């Protein structure tokens, strides 16, 4: 998917509200 410009190393993705999910410590939108 496309990177959402957010990392999820220490905290979860805030961008999950727009369909992003954590993959390999980076938030991606599938």
UniProtKB/Swiss-Prot annotation:
It holds the Pfam family Cyclotide. Contains 3 disulfide bonds. Keywords: Disulfide bond, Knottin, Plant defense. InterPro entries: Cyclotide (IPR005535), Cyclotide_bracelet_CS (IPR012323), Cyclotide_sf (IPR036146). There is a cross-link at residues 1-30 (Cyclopeptide (Gly-Asp)). GO terms for biological process: defense response. Disulfide bonds join 4-20, 8-22, 13-27. Probably participates in a plant defense mechanism. The presence of a 'disulfide through disulfide knot' structurally defines this protein as a knottin. Belongs to the cyclotide family. Bracelet subfamily. This is Cyclotide cter-H. It comes from Clitoria ternatea (Butterfly pea). The lineage of its organism: Eukaryota, Viridiplantae, Streptophyta, Embryophyta, Tracheophyta.
